[in-house]
């Protein structure tokens, strides 16, 4: 039986539009735009297209702060992914996307379809996906549910990425109690493209057919975008129908077929876009709106895998592995023949019109007819009230945290056992990071590196964000996230080019949360301007709260850099006994927001570590110069756990040791001061390296040793640790916690 849909009168009087996600004022605005009351289908279209997830209605004023232009930018925000120029007619397309709410409800499918969606965003631009990264947040690994979420999310990422044949080469994971009921799953995809092949998501040319390609439409994921735009509750776990189910093998076929169309039929392809959040309504209305055109869709022609689907369900379904193409009139047969070779369905479901209306026809009747710009462009924009949280001033005035360091080696071991610091090998070993055989630096170093076939170049890539610093001070923390990403790229031999941002925050209707969003954007913008890394794509995920408890502000920074010559590739691990160890940067007693403060105090508080962007940029440029001149054997940025953790990590891979004398007291061994790098150079390169760095705060600490022992001295203080012991703790912590 067909579903009986509510009448316009019932929608208004019973306020059914509220259940669908529209406020009273938004419903009134829709009525005024249409000059009448919307029917059920139209109400659904507006509710999903005006959700935060699709319209950015709460975050647009903040997003306008970001610098988005630069000579390296080929495509900025507004399309499926951003693209930067790497020379020789090549570009790199990349974007990060969140799938947080679905991953709490159905962690395997939530994570898997997050991967599938971001891959489609990248190949819809005309780029071949060459790598995946992720940024994950979970609660502490002390409850069965947290362990279950970690295992299932990682399995979902691996299941989809491994099956489709795209290597998962890097990422980051942090564990904090605020993520227990609000896990974050951010996936980033990087693709390679010839600049001449860049596509747009547009439907233009009056009478041109619009084609639906890929999997059939089912009832999965209806209102997924609205679901991602509201606060969570315990009952939210029941919303499994709003989570989509993915098929990576179908996506692999879709990827190859779409790239074939772009390569061989670019003369007849007008536009291409994936069906992601809000499914068919979002992709089709956006494509028409961007081109200043209208659209007429015949819902009877939409491939359906379930019986009696209504236009409402077909338009809002978020079934996976579907694309929308606009092609030139008279060429449908060629496109269908190509998709046919891949065993994929490709059908005409509508055409471009010149009236700027979005018209939906079903069984010969017009079931929706609304201005296309009203859906895709004209959602109301809210300037939310913003209030500094009381904690911020308290943190500014608080006395700095001083750690208890009676036994330095014991503290060292405890830190290396913390899951945020410990080796993530247990996680990344589940990912195929060598498929396609271009991965030059595998997971576990500062940045992942993928070779560009047919050239001497490589792409460095990383995801970063220490959300604890943002909790203390969102502006400083936002800048640190960008600076750390750039540090990771530089340490690997790359020049930072641009970022994609995954802005994960709590409920923006709370003024304190909106303040966090604004301040984080200010910090990110300042760092991007200083480091010349414009924001070229991104994603906003708000309402990451459950039962009123929100997450730390977590703007994940995905950064891509260019390694101009494969010879410049540098990793974090010491290479040779006898190499000279240097520390670049100043160490202060900065423990607020640190892993050690969390460990010893059970919570974080106080003033965030300082960041001087001018100094940061100078150190990065000098280090990159030294790397490009072939002077650097290893390079590692100092992050969580500070110098002590970075030094230990540098010894682990080759089973080496270190004998160093540091310029700071041993109680600062685990300080998290910013803008610091641990570097090793061959003795014959020491003089030239020192000359490059001579005006800066650079310290010659000592040498790499052949024995598996670390000796650290400061004046009369000395501490010795076995790297074998440290490594076994570091490697064993996560497998042990997940048991």
Curated annotation (Swiss-Prot):
- Enzyme class comes to ligase
Q: Where does Mg(2+) 1 bind?
A: 97, 539
EC number from the UniProt entry: 6.3.5.3
User: Looking at the keywords, is Ribosomal protein present?
Assistant: no
Where along the chain is ATP bound? Answer: 56, 95, 501, 538
KW Ribonucleoprotein (keyword) present: no
Annotated metabolic or biological route of this protein: Purine metabolism; IMP biosynthesis via de novo pathway; 5-amino-1-(5-phospho-D-ribosyl)imidazole from N(2)-formyl-N(1)-(5-phospho-D-ribosyl)glycinamide: step 1/2
List GO BP terms, alphabetically: 'de novo' IMP biosynthetic process
Which residues take part in binding Mg(2+) 2?
121, 274
Where, subcellularly, is it found? Answer: Cytoplasm
Q: Which residues bind substrate?
A: 98-101, 120, 244, 318-320, 541
Q: Which GO terms describe its molecular function?
A: ATP binding; magnesium ion binding; phosphoribosylformylglycinamidine synthase activity
Q: Which residues form the active site?
A: 53, 99 (proton acceptor)
Coiled-coil residue spans: none
Q: Name one GO cellular component term.
A: cytoplasm
Q: What keywords is this UniProt entry annotated with?
A: ATP-binding, Cytoplasm, Ligase, Magnesium, Metal-binding, Nucleotide-binding, Purine biosynthesis
As its record notes, the protein acts as a catalyst of: N(2)-formyl-N(1)-(5-phospho-beta-D-ribosyl)glycinamide + L-glutamine + ATP + H2O = 2-formamido-N(1)-(5-O-phospho-beta-D-ribosyl)acetamidine + L-glutamate + ADP + phosphate + H(+)
One of its Pfam families is AIRS
Which family, according to the similarity comment?
Belongs to the FGAMS family.
Q: What does this protein do?
A: Part of the phosphoribosylformylglycinamidine synthase complex involved in the purines biosynthetic pathway. Catalyzes the ATP-dependent conversion of formylglycinamide ribonucleotide (FGAR) and glutamine to yield formylglycinamidine ribonucleotide (FGAM) and glutamate. The FGAM synthase complex is composed of three subunits. PurQ produces an ammonia molecule by converting glutamine to glutamate. PurL transfers the ammonia molecule to FGAR to form FGAM in an ATP-dependent manner.
Q: How does it assemble?
A: Monomer. Part of the FGAM synthase complex composed of 1 PurL, 1 PurQ and 2 PurS subunits.
Protein name as annotated: Phosphoribosylformylglycinamidine synthase subunit PurL
Q: Which gene encodes it?
A: purL
């Amino acid at each position: 039986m067909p579903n009986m849909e509510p009448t316009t009168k019932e929608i208004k009087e019973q306020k059914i539009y509220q259940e669908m996600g529209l406020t009273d004022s938004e419903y009134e605005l829709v009525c005024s735009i249409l000059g009448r009351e919307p029917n059920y289908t139209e109400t659904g279209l507006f509710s999903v297209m005006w959700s935060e997830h699709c319209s950015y209605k709460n975050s647009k004023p903040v997003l306008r702060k970001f610098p988005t232009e630069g000579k390296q930018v080929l495509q900025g925000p507004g399309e499926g992914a951003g693209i930067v120029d790497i020379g020789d007619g090549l570009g790199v397309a990349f974007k990060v996307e969140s799938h947080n709410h679905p991953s709490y409800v159905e962690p395997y499918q939530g994570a898997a379809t997050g991967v599938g969606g971001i891959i489609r965003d990248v190949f819809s631009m005309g780029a071949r996906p060459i790598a995946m990264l992720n940024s994950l947040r979970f609660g502490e690994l002390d409850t069965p549910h947290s362990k279950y979420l970690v295992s299932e999310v990682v399995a979902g990422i691996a299941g989809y990425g491994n099956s489709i044949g795209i290597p998962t080469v890097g990422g980051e994971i942090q564990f904090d109690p605020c993520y227990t009921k609000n896990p974050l799953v951010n996936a980033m995809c990087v693709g390679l493209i010839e600049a001449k092949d860049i596509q747009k998501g547009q439907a233009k040319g009056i009478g041109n057919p619009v084609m639906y390609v890929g999997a059939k439409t089912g009832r999965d994921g209806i209102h997924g975008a609205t679901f991602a735009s509201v606060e969570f509750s315990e009952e939210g776990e029941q919303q499994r129908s709003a989570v989509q189910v993915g098929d990576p093998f179908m996506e692999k076929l879709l990827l190859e077929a779409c790239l074939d169309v772009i390569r061989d039929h670019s003369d007849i392809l007008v536009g291409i876009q994936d069906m992601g959040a809000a499914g068919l309504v979002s992709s089709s209305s956006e494509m028409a709106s961007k081109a200043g055109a209208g659209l007429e869709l015949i819902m009877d022609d939409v491939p359906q895998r379930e019986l009696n689907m209504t236009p409402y369900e077909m338009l809002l379904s978020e079934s996976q592995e579907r694309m929308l193409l606009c092609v030139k009139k008279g060429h449908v047969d060629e496109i269908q023949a190509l998709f046919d070779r891949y065993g994929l369905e490709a059908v005409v479901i509508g055409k471009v019109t010149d009236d700027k209306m979005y018209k939906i026809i079903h069984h010969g009747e017009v079931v929706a007819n609304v201005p296309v710009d009203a859906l895709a462009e004209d959602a109301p924009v809210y300037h939310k009230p913003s209030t500094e949280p009381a904690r911020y001033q308290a943190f500014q005035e608080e006395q700095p945290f001083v750690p208890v360091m009676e036994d330095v080696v014991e503290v060292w071991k405890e830190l290396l056992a913390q899951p945020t610091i410990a080796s993530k090998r247990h996680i990344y070993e589940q990912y195929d990071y060598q498929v396609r055989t271009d991965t030059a630096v595998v997971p576990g170093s500062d940045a992942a590196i993928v070779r560009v076939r047919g050239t001497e170049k490589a792409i460095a890539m990383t995801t970063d964000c220490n959300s604890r610093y943002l909790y203390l001070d969102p502006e400083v923390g936002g800048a640190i996230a960008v600076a750390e990403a750039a540090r990771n790229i530089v340490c690997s031999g790359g020049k930072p080019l641009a970022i994609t941002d995954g802005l994960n925050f709590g409920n923006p209707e709370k003024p304190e949360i909106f303040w966090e969003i604004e301040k984080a954007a200010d910090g990110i913008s300042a760092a991007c301007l200083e480091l010349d890394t414009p924001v070229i794509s991104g994603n906003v995920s708000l309402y990451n709260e459950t039962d009123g408890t929100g997450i730390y502000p977590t703007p994940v920074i995905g950064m891509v850099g260019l390694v101009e010559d494969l010879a410049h590739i540098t990793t974090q691990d010491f290479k040779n006994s006898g190499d000279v160890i240097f520390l670049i940067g100043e160490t202060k007693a900065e423990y607020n927001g640190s892993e050690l403060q969390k460990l010893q105090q059970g919570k974080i508080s106080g003033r965030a570590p300082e960041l001087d962007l001018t100094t940061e940029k100078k150190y990065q440029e000098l280090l990159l110069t030294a790397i490009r001149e072939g002077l650097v054997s290893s390079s590692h940025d100092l992050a969580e756990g500070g110098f002590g953790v970075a030094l230990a990590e540098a010894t682990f891979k080759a089973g080496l040791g270190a004998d160093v004398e540091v310029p700071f007291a041993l109680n600062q061994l685990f300080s998290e001061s910013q803008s610091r790098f641990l570097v090793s150079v061959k003795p014959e390169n020491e003089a030239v390296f020192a000359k490059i760095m001579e005006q800066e705060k650079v310290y010659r600490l000592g040498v790499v040793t052949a024995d598996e022992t670390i000796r650290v001295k400061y004046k009369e203080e000395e501490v010795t640790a076995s790297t074998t012991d440290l490594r076994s703790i570091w490697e064993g912590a996560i497998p042990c916690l997940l048991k």
